[in-house]
Amino acid sequence: MTSIYTSTEPTNSAFTTEDYKPQLVEGVNSVLVIGSGGLSIGQAGEFDYSGSQAIKALKEDNKFTILVNPNIATNQTSHSLADKIYYLPVTPEYITYIIELERPDAILLTFGGQTGLNCGVALDESGVLAKYNVKVLGTPIKTLITSEDRDLFASALKDINIPIAESFACETVDEALEAAERVKYPVIVRSAYALGGLGSGFANNASEMKELAAQSLSLAPQILVEKSLKGWKEVEYEVVRDRVGNCITVCNMENFDPLGVHTGDSMVFAPSQTLSDEEFHMLRSAAIKIIRHLGVIGECNVQYALQPDGLDYRVIEVNARLSRSSALASKATGYPLAYTAAKIGLGYTLPELPNPITKTTVANFEPSLDYIVAKIPKWDLSKFQYVDRSIGSSMKSVGEVMAIGRNYEEAFQKALRQVDPSLLGFQGSTEFGDQLDEALRTPTDRRVLAIGQALIHENYTVERVNELSKIDKWFLYKCMNIVNIYKELESVKSLSDLSKDLLQRAKKLGFSDKQIAVTINKHASTNINELEIRSLRKTLGIIPFVKRIDTLAAEFPAQTNYLYTTYNATKNDVEFNENGMLVLGSGVYRIGSSVEFDWCAVNTAKTLRDQGKKTIMINYNPETVSTDFDEVDRLYFEELSYERVMDIYELEQSEGCIISVGGQLPQNIALKLYDNGCNIMGTNPNDIDRAENRHKFSSILDSIDVDQPEWSELTSVEEAKLFASKVNYPVLIRPSYVLSGAAMSVVNNEEELKAKLTLASDVSPDHPVVMSKFIEGAQEIDVDAVAYNGNVLVHAISEHVENAGVHSGDASLVLPPQHLSDDVKIALKDIADKVAKAWKITGPFNMQIIKDGEHTLKVIECNIRASRSFPFVSKVLGVNFIEIAVKAFLGGDIVPKPVDLMLNKKYDYVATKVPQFSFTRLAGADPFLGVEMASTGEVASFGRDLIESYWTAIQSTMNFHVPLPPSGILFGGDTSREYLGQVASIVATIGYRIYTTNETTKTYLQEHIKEKNAKVSLIKFPKNDKRKLRELFQEYDIKAVFNLASKRAESTDDVDYIMRRNAIDFAIPLFNEPQTALLFAKCLKAKIAEKIKILESHDVIVPPEVRSWDEFIGFKAY
């Protein structure tokens, strides 16, 4: 493929003169940017950050930007950023329609993760890019294909004598078995064109290999079988190259875990800590050699396996696109990788680009770090039934944190607290018992606690832990430094016995005030709290210093606002004279708290700046836009703990602190901050507590005459039994102060009640547990609103497609609501008014309400903070709810007048938000939906009606393939209700073949299907044989599964569980909730004929749902 870049001569000239004109790609006025879609395991918020930076870079050059991304929660889909936004599936099919309509001059493929890259390759192979003369900016398609196709990649690296693990590309199971014999077991299997190691794994023998190869080939057309190098060190380099060959390495990183754990699931440190100078330069030179040979133009990530005790190495893989690692590298160094890569894509060379952080140097430099960065992944595996907790070559984490310190211990302990606020820092856990050696040997999401247990409590030596875990001794000796401080603290008998020297040394190694207090209390008969430790250290003058990340290790003057705190310093790098407004970000992405709260935080900062306020953001998530260098006046990459927030609040002498836009984490420390003198903006934290505490909340609802399901506060199992028998099962048990329904459960009988009560009490022992009547079959409604001094300014009413009982974060939301009368809307607004008044709300709040029957409305929850649906309602209605909330915080003349967007405005469009699940990644997990949240992200689409918007939205979820007739559909689940029959009766009329696994279901379906030509076939279901199941799905061409079981499986032997799980494993659409199953069946009936006609046509026919956001809305909002 010929280059679209005009010059090929290398140059090192810096931009100096006014009249110098860079040689840019010619004829590019409009650029199509491909987003990554809904957040999933392996592809998360890092692409919101990189895509947002890319759009900013393009707009600086006056390019018209067209974005396709159905992830409505992201910052990049804010309407102040791209010129045009399409909330449509990121698939070759839909991108072709957009190209047909928009005729862009160029396309950016490397900012949308694996999804975007795969789309680009498919569009090139099908000839679409050539047909419409769309230029690919940045790395050429040929290079992308070479880096993704394992055979081509191996051959390219052989050309330049770069060693890679011996490997064979295979397209069948037999080929894979033969390859494994040739490279000798153990082997690793990798999928080509797959994300986050999806479809990869280790095999120790032929039977394991057969199973793994079959599964991997169902996810990708080609797999690579290679010798396993488990136990070697894993090291990564981020490299940038421009069109004329200038190359720099921006960051190198070292994994704490040896090879065998996917880098996304490994703790990572930057810069590398255990490499010799020779090893460092050997790998750096190889990275530059690789990127030049492959012809990368932009940013690239190179992953190595390095022999622990020698100079032997292998290249594991090259990502010729922006990745999770590049987001981390960008935040770790302060070097704006995505921005620079986008500029390089336009044709700029590195010496022509100013460094936007320092403002005084050019981008053609390698950052130098005078600090250490620690990244730790966040797993949420405990939310899933039957999930396999081991971690390996396929990624399972849902988010990550980044901590900065002046030494390993400081960064490591900070990061551990960030990833789980219930941890004190580096600590042990008694959960392993006599399985401790096994816990050290096998990587799981809990292994770091096993290391803590071994070193702190079980007196294991570094040698023994190293032998079992293969983790480098350097890291373990550093952990021992923390252990030694623990030992010293254990001998302290009282607060007055704690010396300044010990306190200072503990703080320098990353100990928190609370950690110090708890450690002393455990071994002395004291009851010291963290506030007393804080008071003592302040009296002794032990206060953290604020340091600046300047990318240049303080060698050049820098103007960065990118800050962290440390006890390993002697002076501050900044002056504290701005009294900025503090905004607390969302912290780590996890199930229940994701990119939507980052959108809220970013929009809060933007509105504050628009109002002339100085802004200070605290957040520690490297995947976010809120931690980008140009979003706020000052950014602290720091913990969201009481201790750290108060440190920064006091140092900065902040005007106030906003705690209600970052989800549950900031909310949890609000009361403590307020009680200790922090000016909390908006609703009084005492009032927030009255909503978070279930008992207080329910009592106030009773007092203001707002209906709710019957409830009772639990003090004993006996009382609970009495209440349940009074209101009749099912009942809902819920603890206070939780996010995403953690430990919430629906209980159907007395036996379940006893088991669940223990669990609920364990979740938040400091707060009461409340039990309420669970109303089956009711409709659920979300109300998002903003109030000022108890008066509602603006509100949105979204209805759930699913019945109550599915967590609101896993529900499909429809806005404007399609099935609510004006009377119901008026009643909902009345409830919102009463609640806002009773809690004296100023700022955002969200309520979940159930509609039981025609007119009965009952409130089930109220959160006095922004909810995860705030970006959705803001973008669908064209009114920025966060902007209004911030104006309410500030008060005065800028507070807008109240407006009713639900009754006084008519809409000729509908938007539907649907959840994005990541069950494919979570081996064994039951994809059954309930009151505890399971989705990792969301997507939304617009349409003229509910059918059109849901049809587009469901196709926007990752790897969703619409089943085309006459393929087969497998039915299973509960036959005591009508739903399954209603779904079957619809799909039978469209020409699908209908299958089931037992006589009862067959008879039931036959009774419901009225179509004369349709027949129900019974198939033998080999439930315990994965290979035969796969063959069965292929033989009967099963392309969708409707399994409407009414409750979770009680064992992994349950046929419904096996049906659900295998639909996920074989990448087949699964519908297991009655209302969404019915809605999808109606979509198929309405849309499938049109889809088939479009797919069979030789011309490009654009379906009616392909319209941009502003075409639906009718105006360009905020």
Swiss-Prot record:
| Region spans: Oligomerization domain | 421-573
Tell me the residue numbers annotated for binding Mg(2+) 1. 303, 317
Q: Which PROSITE patterns match?
A: ATP_GRASP, CPSASE_1, CPSASE_2, MGS
Binding-site positions, ATP 2: 734, 773, 775, 780, 805-808, 848, 861
Chain residues that bind Mg(2+) 4: 861, 863
Note down the stretches annotated as region Carbamoyl phosphate synthetic domain.
574-958
Region annotation (Carboxyphosphate synthetic domain) maps to 23-420
> Main site of residence?
cytoplasm
Which residue ranges does the record assign to the ATP-grasp domain? 154-346, 698-890
Q: Where does Mn(2+) 3 bind?
A: 848, 861
Which signals induce this protein?
Negatively regulated by arginine.
State where Mn(2+) 1 binds.
303, 317
On pH dependence, the entry says: Optimum pH is 8.0.
Q: Specify which residues bind Mg(2+) 2 according to the UniProt entry for this protein.
A: 317, 319
- Report the residue ranges that make up the MGS-like domain in this protein: 960-1118
Any one GO BP annotation for this protein: L-arginine biosynthetic process
Broad EC category: ligase
Entry cofactors: Mg(2+); Mn(2+)
Compartment(s) of residence: Cytoplasm
NCBIfam families cross-referenced by the UniProt entry: CPSaseII_lrg (TIGR01369), PRK05294.1 (NF003671), PRK12815.1 (NF009455)
Q: What is known of its domains?
A: The large subunit is composed of 2 ATP-grasp domains that are involved in binding the 2 ATP molecules needed for carbamoyl phosphate synthesis. The N-terminal ATP-grasp domain (referred to as the carboxyphosphate synthetic component) catalyzes the ATP-dependent phosphorylation of hydrogencarbonate to carboxyphosphate and the subsequent nucleophilic attack by ammonia to form a carbamate intermediate.
Specify the protein name: Carbamoyl phosphate synthase arginine-specific large chain
Name the gene: CPA2
